[in-house]
Design a protein with these regions (language model features):
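RNA pseudouridine synthases
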Residues: 1-476
């Protein structure tokens, strides 16, 4: 069963293939020059389900009569490379388990976008569709939109049932318009090539190679889930008909959730500890997916009446939350959060998965000031944005170190931006050490995100007295 590209722990075979690819790039000056500035690379393990001469779903021939005057297709040589057989795109470390009766596994490699201005690099699968970017010149915003529409009509992809559809149609079926660059990520390139050549996908992973970008949190060697904006609708279509693991984030069963713990309750409010993996408040309905139970739902049942949210906590994060029992109490508590009169502190385990970074000594304190903004094409990820980002400030203190290269830290946010602590820990201009278990920002694999809301202090909405709650977390 193929792992879900939107939430996964990379298979050992994928990790080894990625390391082999990175080593090959490091040892090849021409490749190192192409990728040194930073690039998302993809690895797909496949089984040859058909003989090399029995290729199904061969790429369609496009008619140049459909090409607008301002655009042209790639060269005939490039087109032949797109329609060529499988040779040249497999890792030399192929596995052959004929003695055990298993089919041999092979690895396909791809990169996102262009490398050195080219869509073709020897040893990597070709793009879904090729054109010469320099030949496409938009003369007006309307012309630009028409060219974009035309291009996405040419991007014909296949799914596991052998069906074909253009990228524009796939997004239109969902009431969406494909963002620029859709179809150029590594994962859709890999799946397209495999499905066109009778190969069965076994495992997939995307990892970053090279320098970290200024805005996004990307660490060389770290694996990341497929993006949601460009690849969400596209991969959902391409994976139809394949045996794919369900997204564990869409099911409470994955988390084996413990019940929340109520820490305090009176007629105005209730304070509880949320377990990791539970939604703080109900999420948006997803067609075909059963709604997940949130802490707000659980507390409503516990109290026998609705409770009202006053703040948020990431699904992956555990710890203290306060809910109001009346609109008046909710307004008073929310005002404290908005005026930053609520005191909060978190505990986290952080590390450098590569093992190359030196850890700060216990007792080290510091302040991280990095403005944050949404990554619009990969929600819910956030990125550092000095131009449009909102101010975000976090104090940190290193409490102790572990022999395995992890550090236990206290984090005190003075602003409440989405994923603030996760980005401030992981970004190269922040702590530079992602939180362990952070699947979005390159943390070392773990059963859960090692982040816990351990301290919460506010004034009671009715009588104004200061209320302070503390919670320890072993992260067992």
């Amino acid at each position: 069963m193929l792992n879900n590209p939107f939430c996964y722990t990379p298979a050992p075979s994928i990790v080894e293939a990625a390391r082999a690819l990175a080593a090959r790039i490091d040892a090849t000056p021409s490749l190192r020059a192409l990728f040194a500035e930073g690039k998302m690379l993809g690895v797909l393990e496949v089984e040859r389900s058909l003989s090399s001469s029995d290729v199904r779903l061969a790429p369609e021939k496009r008619s140049l009569r459909r090409t607008p005057p301002a655009a042209s297709l790639a060269s005939e040589k490039a087109q032949r490379r797109m329609a060529s057989g499988c040779e040249g795109f497999f890792s030399p470390e192929q596995t052959d388990d004929r003695a055990s009766g298993a089919r041999p596994s092979m690895f396909l490699y791809a990169f996102s976008g262009l490398a050195g201005g080219s869509a073709f690099v020897e040893g990597f699968v070709p793009p879904i569709y090729a054109y010469k970017p320099d030949s496409i010149r938009a003369t007006s915003p309307e012309h630009s939109r028409q060219l974009q529409d035309w291009l996405f009509d040419q991007y014909i992809v296949v799914n596991g049932r052998g069906e074909r559809r253009s990228i524009r149609q796939i997004f239109a079926d969902r009431g969406l318009v494909p963002p620029g660059g859709t179809g150029e990520c590594a994962a859709p390139k890999l799946l397209q090539y495999a499905l066109l050549h009778g190969l069965t996908p076994v495992a997939i992973g995307e990892f970053w190679y090279g320098a970290s970008p200024e805005r996004e949190v990307r660490r060389s060697g770290a694996f990341y889930p497929a993006c949601t904006g460009k690849c969400g609708p596209l991969l959902a279509y391409m994976l139809e008909g394949l045996d794919v693991e369900p997204n564990p984030l869409e099911s409470d069963a994955h988390w084996q959730l413990a019940d929340p713990v109520v820490r305090y309750e009176d007629r105005d409010l209730i304070v509880a500890e949320k377990p990791a993996g539970m939604l703080a408040v109900p999420g948006r309905p997803v067609p075909g997916v059963a709604p997940r139970r949130s802490l707000q739902d659980w507390l409503a049942d516990y109290c026998g009446a609705p409770v009202l949210a006053c703040h948020r906590l990431d699904m992956d994060t555990s710890g203290l939350m306060v809910f109001a029992k009346s609109p008046e109490a909710q307004a008073a508590l929310q005002e404290q959060f908005e005026k930053r009169e609520v005191s909060k502190a978190y505990l986290a385990w952080v590390s450098d998965p590569s093992g190359k970074a030196s850890l700060p000594e216990p007792g080290t304190r510091g302040k991280i000031v990095l403005p944050l903004a949404p990554d619009w094409y990969d929600r819910p990820r956030q990125q550092v944005d000095p131009d449009q980002g909102k101010p975000a400030v976090t104090d940190y203190e290193v409490l102790r170190l572990r022999d395995d290269g992890a550090a236990f830290v206290r984090l005190i946010p003075y602003t409440g931006r989405t994923h603030q602590l996760r980005v401030h820990c992981a970004h190269k201009d922040g702590l530079g050490l992602p939180i362990i278990g952070d699947r979005l920002y390159g943390g070392a694999p773990a059963p859960r995100l090692m982040l816990h809301a351990a301290h919460l202090s506010f004034r009671h909405p009715a009588d104004g007295r200061r209320m302070t709650f503390a919670s320890s977390q072993s992260f067992d």
